[in-house]
Amino acid sequence: MFGFPTATLLDCHGRYAQNVAFFNVMTEAHHKYDHSEATGSSSWDIQNSFRREKLEQKSPDSKTLQEDSPGVRQRVYECQECGKSFRQKGSLTLHERIHTGQKPFECTHCGKSFRAKGNLVTHQRIHTGEKPYQCKECGKSFSQRGSLAVHERLHTGQKPYECAICQRSFRNQSNLAVHRRVHSGEKPYRCDQCGKAFSQKGSLIVHIRVHTGLKPYACTQCRKSFHTRGNCILHGKIHTGETPYLCGQCGKSFTQRGSLAVHQRSCSQRLTL
């Protein structure tokens, strides 16, 4: 079995393991080793021949070589701005655009730009209506794989994101982030008109309609319009006669939860008299 006389040569052997030229180098090495044994020579020129080989060509943005497993080393590319390291040059290039603000991939439909081509491809589905990711359970389709993954948790009941304060769980991380503001009191979304602040962006959007007068949700029965979809749905129950909120004390039902709450207070007072 072929052996290496020094640790340096063993290290070189590991570096050459993934190189196409390794086969030719080792063939020559075996020949020299056999020849030295036959002649009884104590000198071995393989070490010098290995040293003469150019084992690696370091790029300016390359860091040190980190060893993942014995004999195999991986080049690491480091961001000169923040020090974050990457195993692929392309990943570093993509990351650096965060610092430079460069967004070379532009949507031909609306002009919006993106740092990564993959993000542009996903965005363009807004314009094309393409939804390639379909739920096997209910058939609903999505433009993003991540959106499908979150949706599937409706069927599985999985809620992997838990609040550390109250242990309430959520299907996605963004909902958890919004929930945390209940505990922190943070309201980062502020109305430019009146200064009122909100914990959710959607709540601010709905609030702004109070100032603009915009009522985008119209009743299909009477064409009455509303600021929110929820209020429109609630109004629709007047036409359908649906009264899903039932008083447990007297059996009277209501179209709105708020109406039931008001009724229950007076109902309780009557029963205690």
Curated annotation (Swiss-Prot):
Start and end residues, zinc fingers (C2H2-type): 77-99, 105-127, 133-155, 161-183, 189-211, 217-239
GO BP, sorted A to Z: regulation of transcription by RNA polymerase II
Keyword annotations: DNA-binding, Metal-binding, Nucleus, Repeat, Transcription, Transcription regulation, Zinc, Zinc-finger
Domain of life: Eukaryota
Entry's Gene Ontology molecular function annotations: DNA-binding transcription factor activity, RNA polymerase II-specific; RNA polymerase II cis-regulatory region sequence-specific DNA binding; sequence-specific double-stranded DNA binding; zinc ion binding
Signal peptide: none
UniProt binding sites for Zn(2+) 2: 107, 110, 123, 127
Binding site for Zn(2+) 5: 247, 250, 263, 267
Subcellular location: Nucleus
Zinc finger map (CCHC-type): 245-267
Sequence positions that bind Zn(2+) 4: 198, 201, 214, 218
Annotated Gene Ontology cellular component terms: nucleus
Annotated positions binding Zn(2+) 1: 79, 82, 95, 99
Family recorded in the similarity comment: Belongs to the krueppel C2H2-type zinc-finger protein family.
Biological role stated in the UniProt entry: May be involved in transcriptional regulation.
Name the UniProt record assigns to this protein: Zinc finger protein 32
Organism this protein belongs to: Homo sapiens
